[in-house]
Each structure stands twice: as C-alpha cells, then as structure tokens.
Design a protein with these regions (language model features):
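ATP-binding N-terminal substructure of ATP-dependent carboxylate-amine bond-forming enzymes
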Residues: 1-95
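Short, conserved charged micro-motifs
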Residues: 165-168, 236-238, 331-334, 386-393
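Short acidic-hydrophobic, aromatic-tinged amphipathic segments that line or gate anion-handling sites
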Residues: 45-56, 122-127, 158-161
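C-terminal hydrophobic structural anchor segments
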Residues: 333-392
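Active-site "cap" helix and flanking loop/linker of ATP-utilizing ligase/carboxylase catalytic domains
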Residues: 241-262, 278-351, 356-359
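A conserved helix-loop-beta module that forms one wall/lid of the active-site cleft
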Residues: 94-157, 326
Length: 431
C-alpha cells in the first residue's frame, strides 16, 4: 500500500521533500503554511493554503497521512496543535515538553548545564535597562537572539563580535518578547543531526551552514543559509553527538523524545559548546540528507513510529552542497520590485528546488509580494557527490544556468569547503 506524506511548509523545503519522497514511492500533499513560496510544492500535486483552511485537521481526516513533516516549529503555536497531538497524528517532531529544547533558549542552555554540556555564557532580559545592566556587570561580545525560537519573532540573530558592537545593538533591538544574550565564541561552527527512535540515538550527518548574505562571509545574516555543506556521518566522527546529544539521554527518555534533533555548536579552545538545538529537519540540510539515504521514506516512517531504524547510505552521495540564488535586493527591504523573469538556460544536472517564484502563462518570475517588500530567495541548487570538491564543482557549474536580473549567489563555496576540511581535520587530530 502506498504511504501518504503531508508536508507543512512552503518553498524549496516543501518542493524538495515532496519530490524526493515521491521518487521513493510516496503519495504526497502539502499544507501551505505561509502566503508565498507556493509554486514548487503546487507543481507536485495537491496543496491547501492556510489562508483557505485555518486548520489542517479536516485535511488530515481526508488525506489520512502516514507521515506529517513540518518545516518549522511554528506549527506548535497554532490553535489546532494540541488537537493534532491528542488525536495521535504522525507528526515528524517531538511533542509536548520535548519541544522545549528548541523553543526556549534559556531552558535549553540550563538543560545543558544540568547534564554537563558546555554552553556559552547567557542571559535572558526583558528590556533595554536590563540589557544595559548585563553589559555593565558582565561585558562581553554577545549574539543577540529572540528568547523564543520562532520564524516570526521580532529579533533574528545579530552576531556582535565586540563589546562595542553589543552596546550599540542593545539600543536598537525590539524587546517585545525580551532578549537572549549568548556569548560570542568565534567562527568554528558546525552542526550534527540525529534521529531518536526505538530508544536509540542514530547519528546522520554533520553540516555547516553559511548565513552571511555575501561572498567572503560579508553582509548581514540572512533568514536562512545562502550555502551549506553536508557530510554523511553515521559514526559521529567529530564527536558532536557524543559530547552534546548523548549526555541528554535521561532527559530524552523522560520526555519521550521521538524524531529528529540537531545540535549547532561552536568549538573554542578545542571544546565543542552547544549554542542551539533544533527539533526538525533543517531547511538547508533536509534535501541533501534525504538524497543521501537509500530508503528515505521507510527511514522517516520508522522514526515517526518510534521503531528501531537501520540506516542505509548511498556511497556515491557522501557529501552534499547547497547554494541559494538570491533575488534583487535580498536580504534587504526593497520597495517596488517589478515582476522579474527567471530563466533556466538548460536543464540542471543536479537538484533545483524553487523558493519564491510565481508562474504566469508558462513564464517564471521572482515573486513581488505587495506586503513583503524584500528581495527574495529564488531557488536552491543542491548537488551530492562521493567527495566534497566534486559536489562543489558540480553545483558551481549548474547554478550558472539560472538567470534573473540582479540576482546573485555566493562565489566562495570552494573556499568554504577548504575551511570545512581544515576545521574537521583539526577536530579529528585532537580526538
């Protein structure tokens, strides 16, 4: 019997997940959670928008999914979330108290301290006066974040590399939901994904994401990475899971944690420090991870059913890279952007996942939403290969086939790969 999968999301994430799982035999549909990024998922089959269907529960009753994959943790904030959990729908996410490890940055950091996991110094304040007091009592460079992890939070991460940077930004941020200050530890950053099911923690991949908008790691942090590198790592070669996830096992068992878990960490003085946990498949990493697995559909079904999972990997896809084509003005506010055509000169020899594009009479255009006056992410181009530099070369060749006026992509993927190799070689030498 064909397994049914419903994705809660939009853009390249929904496009990629549906396409790859369809290739593996699934029937898919998509609940479009945001008012943009509909073209990719809509090209693959049945979709419903949250604007027309405020609750997806009646759609679940109709479609009867075997697996529900959310793009963001924001689903848990919806008025229908409690009913989804109570009714036992197969959501690919931990639920209830297990979600707190991502949702609350302070609780996550305190949990790490409880189990002996290194974390940066941190403070949670409610207003500007409290932030000034922290800088008076404990002056350091801090990364400024919203205390509650949500894509709709008023603050997106601001990395301050000096005390002066921090003093400047605490005067400008929006304190509507408070402010989380996390000590800045440097740039040796990496992430690691695991699946937790059947009482086991199964390592998957180690990744790096590059969120600076421009080549050379310059410009502001974008809302999502502009580039990414992923490596199959079921043996946890760099110790990220061993040091930052496995110590949490008593808490994972206590909360009944089932699903994906990612840790993002920074290495300082030879020690990994946990800076963030995510309870979902990553926007950048998911499509590459699913490509690397020989049987992605059955693997996800085993996890959501809390069964022991045997991972099978494609050796010809040991490494993967992702590169985003960003539209005119991204990531800044740019009013009155016209409907700019997007052209593909010849079919790509790797994956192309559409983000914010619209179709009109067979022609694709960069989205130009009247209420979202920012440059947009047009597409993600992904490539897998047996080695990292082959993936880098392939993706660099293929993204050139895309054209949209004044669009851009990062030109330093090879340099990022060099830094990736240097970092992880150093880590392995010190283990």
């Amino acid at each position: 019997m064909t397994s049914r999968v419903m994705v809660l999301g939009v853009g390249a994430f929904a496009h990629a997940v549906q396409s790859i799982l369809q290739e593996d035999g699934a029937e898919t549909a998509c609940y479009l959670t945001r008012p943009y990024g509909h073209y990719g998922p809509s090209a693959l089959g049945q979709t419903w928008s949250a604007e027309d269907h405020p609750s997806p529960l009646p759609l679940f009753e109709k479609f009867k999914p075997d697996l529900i994959i959310p793009q963001a943790v924001a689903w848990a904030e919806q008025p229908w979330a409690a009913d989804l959990v109570q009714q036992g729908w197969p959501i690919f996410s931990p639920v209830n108290d297990a979600m707190r490890i991502e949702i609350s940055r302070q609780e996550s950091s305190e949990l790490c301290r409880q189990y002996g996991i290194p974390v940066p110094a941190f403070h949670h304040v409610q207003n500007r006066l409290e932030a000034r007091k922290i800088m008076q009592d404990d002056p350091r460079p801090y990364v400024l974040k919203n205390p509650i992890c949500s894509p709709f939070s008023p603050i997106h991460a601001i990395i301050c590399e000096s005390v002066a940077d921090t003093l400047g930004w605490i005067e400008r941020v929006d304190y509507a939901e408070g402010l989380f200050l996390q000590e800045y530890l440097g740039k040796e950053e990496a992430g690691h994904f695991v699946f937790i099911s059947g009482g086991e923690i199964s390592s998957l991949v180690t990744n790096q994401e590059f969120k600076r908008a421009f080549t050379g790691d310059m410009g502001p942090l974008a809302g999502a990475p502009l580039a990414g590198i992923v490596e199959q790592d079921p043996e946890d070669k760099y110790g990220l899971a061993r040091e930052l996830i496995h110590p949490l096992k008593p808490w994972l068992e206590k909360t009944g944690y089932t699903g994906p878990l990612q840790v993002t960490a920074i290495r300082k003085n030879g020690v990994w420090h946990a800076i963030e946990y995510n309870i979902r498949l990553g926007v950048t990493t998911t499509a590459l991870l699913l490509r690397m697995l020989k049987n992605p559909l059955q693997t996800l079904l085993n996890v959501v059913r809390n069964q022991t999972t045997v991972l099978e990997w494609s050796p010809e896809k040991n490494f993967g890279c992702s590169l985003t084509l960003a539209g005119y003005g991204y990531p800044y506010v740019v009013p009155s952007v016209p409907k700019l055509p997007v052209e593909v000169s010849t079919p790509l020899e790797c994956d192309l996942w559409w983000n914010e594009v619209d179709e009109d009479s067979g022609q694709l255009y960069m989205a130009n939403h009247q209420n979202y006056e920012m440059g947009h992410r047009i597409a993600d181009v992904n490539a897998c290969a047996p080695d990292m530099y082959s993936a880098v070369k392939l993706i660099g060749n293929e993204i050139r086939k895309l054209r949209c006026l004044a669009s851009y992509y990062r030109l330093d993927l090879k340099e990022l790969a060099d830094k990736n190799l240097s970092l992880f070689s150093s880590v392995k030498n010190n283990l």
